[in-house]
């Protein structure tokens, strides 16, 4: 099989009127900030998407009864026996904060050296426009769709999809029984293989706070008075071993271990080797797992306790000789099947008390359960076979990713097979500065989604 080169894909993209039209839609989408955490632009972008889908004949429902509006767009086939294909996406993004390094304005889509750059170009606005491009390209040459197609677009995915369960419960009758749900996004790995996965880790996030005194104290008392930051650091250290294993009683007993097929998929996985991760991220510290299979199992199938940030004391110019009275940390546990967010936090509370750190106060912020698809479902196997036609380096199949999303919520509501694949690359820098996708990958995703629609003929 002969595959087009990257330059040939770029040229096809530039000559494709449908793709170019929705590229301009993407430019507009990226220019419209839509950040749930800051409550910025959510209704504006939801309404803009509604208009875009209405223009091409979709039945559009915008539900503004939630903090972030939901947008649902239906394209119906006239076939009485038509199956249903669902695309789940989100239009919210993380902020483009001042501590991120951007070469150009993150909210002005830019193109350089075969790449598109902008906040949301991969996560997840670019996936919306690419998938709509694929649908429109199919409809250009056909009077009817071979499959019903529904788009579900939410605006709170980056904040744990706060209302998705309620929304799906209200609309489940319109969506339950679908043949397949294509998840929000996906990526090619460093070997240029398309990653196809069917699950994700869950998460529980929480704040840990310590108050050691009414006021900051002169540091001359450091040998006799405990300070908030030292107390908090010792408490956190007691929860994790040097190799990264979580030291919380009863946690691992509830973990659902991967089955033989899932471990077999891990054996054939070509990406996330320890050396590759060190190279991509320029790691300066030793890895917690050096042996390949132990590294991969920990990455995909084990929970992880992470510190997102720590704050305490003086951070200004020069010195300030104090014992800070307060310290806080933002923490998370990445969850796997068998672990429930509130239960995990309760176990951590009990462990801190047992370890002698009862003065640490914990505050739950958000949580999501984990999920793993059955990758042998016929609709998922169809995607895997179709993808092989478009990616010269092949595909890499995994039952889960190490990231987090509301797959569990969606499956509970709709009971539909779910698969994730997309247009990102191994260095798309989602959530960081210079978020990007290759133009060639963007166009290949359009072609694959169009082929997926065609496969229902």
Could you describe each region identified by the protein language model?
Residues 2-99, 326:
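N-terminal helical capping/dimerization or prosegment-like subdomains
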Residues 82-153, 444:
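Active-site metal-coordination/substrate-binding segment of hydrolases
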Residues 91-93, 115, 152-160, 184-189, ...:
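Acidic, glycine-rich active-site loops and adjacent beta-strand->loop/helix elements
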Residues 166, 222-244:
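A short core secondary-structure module
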Residues 195-211, 421:
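Flexible glycine/proline-rich, aromatic-decorated loop/lid segments
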């Amino acid at each position: 099989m002969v595959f087009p080169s990257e330059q040939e894909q770029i040229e096809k993209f530039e000559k494709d009127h449908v793709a170019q039209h929705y590229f301009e839609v993407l430019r507009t989408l990226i220019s419209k900030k839509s950040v749930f955490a800051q409550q910025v632009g959510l209704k504006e972008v939801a309404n803009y998407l509604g208009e875009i889908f209405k223009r091409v004949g979709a039945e559009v429902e915008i539900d503004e009864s939630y903090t972030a509006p939901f947008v649902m767009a239906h394209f119906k086939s006239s076939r009485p026996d038509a199956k249903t294909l669902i695309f789940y996406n989100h239009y919210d993004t993380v902020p483009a904060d001042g501590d991120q390094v951007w070469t150009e304005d993150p909210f002005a889509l830019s193109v350089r050296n075969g790449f598109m750059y902008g906040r949301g170009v991969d996560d997840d606005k670019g996936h919306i426009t690419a998938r709509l491009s694929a649908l429109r390209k199919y409809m250009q040459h056909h009077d009817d769709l071979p499959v019903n197609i529904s788009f579900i677009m939410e605006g709170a995915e980056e904040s744990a999809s706060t209302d998705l369960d309620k929304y799906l419960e209200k609309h489940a009758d319109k969506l339950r029984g679908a043949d397949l749900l294509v998840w929000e996004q996906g990526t090619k790995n460093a070997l240029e293989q398309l990653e196809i996965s069917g699950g994700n880790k869950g998460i529980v996030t929480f704040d840990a706070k310590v108050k050691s005194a009414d006021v900051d104290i002169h540091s001359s008392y450091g040998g006799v008075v405990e300070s908030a930051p030292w107390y908090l650091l010792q408490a956190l250290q007691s929860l994790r071993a040097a190799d990264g294993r979580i030291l919380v009683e009863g946690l691992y007993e509830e973990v659902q271990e991967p089955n033989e097929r899932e471990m077999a998929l891990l054996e054939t996985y070509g990406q996330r080797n320890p050396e590759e991760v060190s190279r991509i991220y320029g790691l300066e510290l030793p890895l917690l797992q050096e042996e390949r299979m132990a590294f991969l199992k920990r990455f995909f199938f084990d929970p992880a306790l992470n510190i997102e940030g720590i704050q305490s004391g003086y951070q200004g110019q020069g010195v300030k000789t104090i014992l800070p009275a307060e310290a806080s940390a933002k923490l998370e546990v990445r969850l796997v099947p068998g672990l429930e967010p509130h239960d995990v936090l309760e176990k951590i509370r009990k462990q801190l008390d047992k370890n002698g750190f009862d003065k640490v106060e914990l505050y739950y912020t958000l949580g999501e359960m984990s999920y793993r698809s059955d990758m042998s479902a016929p609709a998922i196997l169809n995607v895997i076979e179709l993808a092989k036609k478009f990616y010269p380096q092949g595909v890499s199949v995994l039952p889960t990713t190490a990231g987090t999303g509301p797959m569990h919520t969606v499956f509970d509501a709709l009971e539909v097979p779910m698969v994730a694949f997309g247009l990102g690359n191994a260095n798309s820098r989602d959530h960081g500065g210079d978020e990007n996708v290759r133009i060639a990958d963007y166009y290949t995703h359009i072609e694959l989604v169009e082929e997926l629609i065609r496969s229902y003929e």
